[in-house]
Amino acid sequence: MSGFFTSLDPRRVQWGAAWYAMHSRILRTKPVESMLEGTGTTTAHGTKLAQVLTTVDLISLGVGSCVGTGMYVVSGLVAKEMAGPGVIVSFIIAAVASILSGVCYAEFGVRVPKTTGSAYTYSYVTVGEFVAFFIGWNLILEYLIGTAAGASALSSMFDSLANHTISRWMADSVGTLNGLGKGEESYPDLLALLIAVIVTIIVALGVKNSIGFNNVLNVLNLAVWVFIMIAGLFFINGKYWAEGQFLPHGWSGVLQGAATCFYAFIGFDIIATTGEEAKNPNTSIPYAITASLVICLTAYVSVSVILTLMVPYYTIDTESPLMEMFVAHGFYAAKFVVAIGSVAGLTVSLLGSLFPMPRVIYAMAGDGLLFRFLAHVSSYTETPVVACIVSGFLAALLALLVSLRDLIEMMSIGTLLAYTLVSVCVLLLRYQPESDIDGFVKFLSEEHTKKKEGILADCEKEACSPVSEGDEFSGPATNTCGAKNLPSLGDNEMLIGKSDKSTYNVNHPNYGTVDMTTGIEADESENIYLIKLKKLIGPHYYTMRIRLGLPGKMDRPTAATGHTVTICVLLLFILMFIFCSFIIFGSDYISEQSWWAILLVVLMVLLISTLVFVILQQPENPKKLPYMAPCLPFVPAFAMLVNIYLMLKLSTITWIRFAVWCFVGLLIYFGYGIWNSTLEISAREEALHQSTYQRYDVDDPFSVEEGFSYATEGESQEDWGGPTEDKGFYYQQMSDAKANGRTSSKAKSKSKHKQNSEALIANDELDYSPE
């Protein structure tokens, strides 16, 4: 027992080391270099995913995953119950909000193009392993539910065309399953099971086959859309948009409808999951995301216009609005034409949910966060066939046992969370130093920030030589660059915000003068009034930045500015969550104009604006990409606000189910993923490799130059780790080493350290290379 209590002695348990090890594991990031230029696309089984997708294929995937449910279901639902003919405005507002998240996805797709896994991979590269697993796990949930819901919706469509004979037969012959669905007549949906299995087989047969099937259905859906537009023009009536009829529920109904219409645009992230299978992802991904959102908006608005002009908004059928609007005018043949389009659109939406799900599973399994057998890629179909079969089976099981109403309620929370994290990642990456983009979470460490503060990222390259850490230097960290001498932090021009590129450009017309940037004669195109305005407000702006403690407006961010942005984004997320919660759950106090409620709202708005302003004043990373999200930091910040608001609008039962799913994911991650991660295995191999040379480490008190002696029988064993140590030796403490006249070389610079160790091994006749 004494040994047990001794092991629990806080002096013996290295709590700090244990916390640091866990902290470093959950925040470790995946190097971007491993996914660039096709690197890392080969699986453990030696098979690559086929790179066969064109820009048109990606647009077809994005449109198909969105337009089915949005055009045939959401338009009628929002028009009747929320916004009336104002559903048109609701779709436009939702489209703007979706485009904000879409441009962030597009930048990430360009930054890390050769990837599968979408937001999961992006988070793994930027935020860290734990957050990436959390996002990927919830993306699996959304695609799983979306597939099951699509199969159930198709089953309901066929049942409706058959006058509900299928559902009655199943309820009478098979029986009901009370408790699995909200309705008392919930029955095992065998037709939905069959549909899910068929689509799973199509996806598993190969990406080219599934994309071809998807394109055919999209063409069919397009033909039906054209038919609706032309046929509907003969039945429109402008009186349904008369005064007071366009916005029957006011702007509150329009905004409520916009929150629902936003879900009709969810699905464009499927484009980002196929980066590894695209022929030219750098240009295809941003173009396909933007084009698919614009096409979906056009389809939704045009259909909503025809729908609300053909029938009064309060008579719209919510289950099949486009079919019933022709029936109301006696055009029964059109019902079956629209039914064909509905089946095609819902099938494409089902395919859009099932297609990315195995690819997210494949990406996570390839990284070791899920079981690695799920990353197997078939050499025949060049698809992650095991992940396809497993995910399709789970989706079919859900479609069989759970009602459509219950499935729809769980569809959006994980996707909205993924959108929010992508916006956060864009904000963080654009303000991090170039050399630390792969692992910017290190900025959370104060010690790392102190080491890096004041050193520009590009000065870690060969053109620049930072002052050695071992040299005694009382001033701040500086650099010497052979190509370009950067101005000091005390330079007024840099603090005011002028670019050092223009200042040190030898081709500048006024190069060599005292002030190259203000020569009116040298640059006649520059406005004289703008120059005078800069001279007038420049000193005041400089003084304001100094008093506010803002950094110099340099072209290159530093570790300190990156750390500032990280903290600001974290606070921004928390404040937005509190703000949206109060707007939603405290709306009664705001509508009553309670002074404290209004004061609280104004205070939070000011705090959010201040954080955005602080982020705006930090220097951005100068790295140019083929596509970059515009108007930073406003676009990602507003996307975060919209996504958080929509997440909080979801029901309580959805959050409870979400919590249960997350708990299962945490068990998998901490029980398996964290210990079998590819990064964990690499770290173990690196530690094992370093231990091979540990005996000859020049940092050791027992250096190769001095040699070492073993303890004799007469000598005390205390200094060698105790009497139980029979073989080998343990390193003595540094204080003992110094007492014996040995000095550690840790005070030396890293470059000198490397040269000494190479020289020691080179001069030795023995071979110390690992076997």
From Swiss-Prot:
One of its GO terms (cellular component) is cytosol. The chain crosses the membrane at residues 58-78, 83-103, 119-141, 187-207, 216-236, 251-271, 291-311, 336-356, 360-380, 384-404, 407-427, 565-585, 596-616, 628-648, 655-675. Glycans are attached at residues 282, 676. Belongs to the amino acid-polyamine-organocation (APC) superfamily. Cationic amino acid transporter (CAT) (TC 2.A.3.3) family. Coiled coil: none annotated. It catalyses: 4-aminobutanoate(in) = 4-aminobutanoate(out). The gene is SLC7A14. Pfam families: AA_permease_2 (PF13520), AA_permease_C (PF13906). This is Solute carrier family 7 member 14. InterPro entries: AA/rel_permease1, CAT_C. It comes from Homo sapiens. The modification Phosphoserine is found at residues 465, 468, 488, 757, 769. It is a multi-pass membrane protein. Gene3D superfamilies: Amino acid/polyamine transporter I. Expressed in skin fibroblasts. The lineage of its organism: Eukaryota, Metazoa, Chordata, Craniata, Vertebrata. Its main location: membrane.
